[in-house]
Amino acid sequence: DSQSVKTTESGGPSGYDAGKKVKGRKRHILTDTSGFLISILVHTADIQDRDGAVDVLKRICQRFPWLRHIFADGGYAGDKLRTALAKAGNWVIEIIKRSDKAKGFEVLPHRWVVERTFAWLGRCRRLAKDWEATVASSTAWAMIASIRM
């Protein structure tokens, strides 16, 4: 899943996420089924979810070759991600979508785990807003915050 975060005037790369109306950076995370952080990728917010997911999967295919099943939200649906998964390995992606009949908030299976991880990261004051000048330091602070989970 991904999270768009506002940046400060400290500089560094930032973009505009038109869907969430946020100028800043986007964090893509991959968690295990317990919600513990496996991988994080931070980049400008103007990159779509399905495009950022390809970069996340490229980073983890060597480190975690035993992964087989990936759950994702509707923002990751599309042929681009399925093609990247086919090239990277023998992975199955399951898109968890909201039902058309749902009104308001609905807890979705498997997706709430990632949202809970974002909430855990959001409890860290340094991660509530992206204060860092570089993407590398922004990634590092998120990894440091995940140690206490």
Predicted feature residues:
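Polybasic low-complexity intrinsically disordered regions
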Residues: 1-90, 97-98, 145
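Basic, amphipathic alpha-helical segments enriched in Lys/Arg and hydrophobic/aromatic residues
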Residues: 83, 90, 95, 104-149
